[in-house]
């Protein structure tokens, strides 16, 4: 009996050791699990009369749809109300109908920023219409197992800003759309995520961001920011760079900015922020200073201005074939910025890969459409257009860091 008992004990012990070894192996595998996600960011999706009078909106997206369909999430800034109860209208007071927004979704966009200076062009009625249009499309695509998201509008006045938590694969993404500029300061401004570009306004926004990050743990926090600054400027001011750093130190990982209608440079910047286990801690040492034991170095992506994705700003008489370097010509060229992030063992890695894809608005027989801006495409054009777009391509290459950027995986 003792012999049998010893055998049984040995078997149980062996089984326990085996289970422990398996559990340890699973834990080690989980620790080394690698998960990547790819975002695509565009410039402004605008709608001048030449755009919304198109017979087939899908043509806008045809040449880049494959790019937008083959990432994890594509982000677009809708720079107009979307209200079916109001007529279509162009600059300076925009409005489109839901089919224009639907075409963007069909074209591959998943996440929309609605906070900008044109969102309240049509007052409360325009905002109500936009909320309704998006809700209807969200419901429609929900039945097709397609999720779409937005930020920047309030259901009613007095609501606090709410970041949208997006779950994709095993990633948690916090998304917030904010504007610092308005065209209309009537009561409809209270339905937008508006942050005044003042010292106090920006201080309040930083506090809001810190609170959001603390209350909703996430892997990455993305801010769509419509900036209070002059249009058509190609250079980034030191003041703007400092503002973006403060946003990152408060908890933002990717700042995706708009308003100038032309592309400005982008960069990966290293900052320090107060964190605990990857999330913001926000504690001090009791003496009024930050406890440095929890300060972490982080790499953040700053897109200072993404220009226009589609518009009617460079079309017809506004195309200066004889002067490709004229300032307004830059409104027709932009990039799709792909950002690839990686987690290792559930922790965000320092490695970031930026892949800018040059695009241009090309006026075909009907209206401007988005084209991949390559020398191969330029070679297919008639001589007059070929000369113009080749010079535009050279100008874009000259001032933008258009080659892919890859940071080393460790600091």
Kindly label every feature range from the protein language model:
Residues 10-19:
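Bacterial N-terminal signal peptides
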Residues 48-49, 82-85, 113, 119-131, ...:
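Active-site environment of divalent metal-dependent phosphoester hydrolases
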Residues 25-123, 130, 140-144, 150:
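N-terminal catalytic scaffold of extracellular/periplasmic and nuclease hydrolases
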């Amino acid at each position: 009996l003792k012999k049998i008992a010893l055998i049984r004990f040995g078997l149980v012990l062996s089984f326990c050791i085996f289970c422990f070894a398996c559990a340890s192996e699973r834990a080690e595998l989980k620790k080394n699990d690698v998960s990547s996600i790819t975002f695509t960011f565009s410039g402004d999706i605008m709608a001048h009369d030449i755009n919304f009078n198109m017979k087939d909106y899908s043509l806008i997206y045809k040449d880049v749809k494959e790019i937008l369909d083959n990432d994890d999430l594509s982000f677009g800034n809708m720079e107009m109300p979307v209200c079916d109860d109001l007529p279509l209208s162009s600059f300076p007071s925009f409005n489109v109908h839901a089919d224009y927004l639907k075409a963007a979704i069909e074209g591959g966009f998943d996440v929309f920023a609605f906070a900008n200076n044109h969102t309240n062009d049509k007052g409360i009625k325009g905002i109500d219409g936009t909320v309704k249009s998006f809700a209807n499309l969200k419901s429609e695509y929900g039945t097709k197992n397609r999720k779409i998201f937005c930020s920047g509008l309030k259901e009613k006045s007095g609501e606090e800003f709410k970041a949208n938590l997006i779950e994709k694969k095993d990633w948690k993404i916090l998304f917030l759309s904010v504007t610092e500029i308005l065209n209309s300061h009537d009561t409809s401004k209270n339905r937008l995520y508006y942050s005044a570009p003042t010292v106090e306004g920006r201080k309040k926004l930083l506090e809001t961001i810190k609170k959001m990050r603390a209350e909703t743990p996430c892997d990455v926090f993305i801010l769509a920011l419509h900036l209070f600054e002059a249009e058509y400027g190609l250079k980034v001011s030191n003041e703007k760079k400092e503002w973006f750093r403060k946003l990152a130190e408060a908890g933002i990982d990717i700042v995706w900015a708009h308003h100038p209608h032309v592309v400005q440079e982008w960069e990966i910047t290293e900052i320090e922020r107060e964190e605990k286990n990857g999330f913001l801690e926000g504690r001090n040492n009791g003496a009024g200073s930050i406890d440095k034991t929890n300060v972490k170095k982080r790499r953040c992506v700053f897109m200072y201005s993404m220009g226009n994705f589609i518009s009617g700003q460079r079309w017809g008489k506004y195309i200066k074939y004889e002067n490709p370097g004229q300032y307004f010509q830059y409104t027709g060229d932009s990039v799709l910025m792909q950002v690839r992030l990686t987690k290792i063992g559930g922790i965000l890695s320092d490695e970031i890969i930026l892949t800018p894809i040059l695009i241009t608005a090309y006026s075909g027989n009907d209206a401007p459409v988005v084209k991949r801006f390559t020398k191969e495409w330029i070679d297919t054009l008639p001589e007059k257009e070929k000369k113009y777009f080749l010079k535009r391509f050279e100008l874009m290459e000259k001032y933008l860091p258009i080659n892919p950027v890859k940071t080393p995986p460790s600091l």
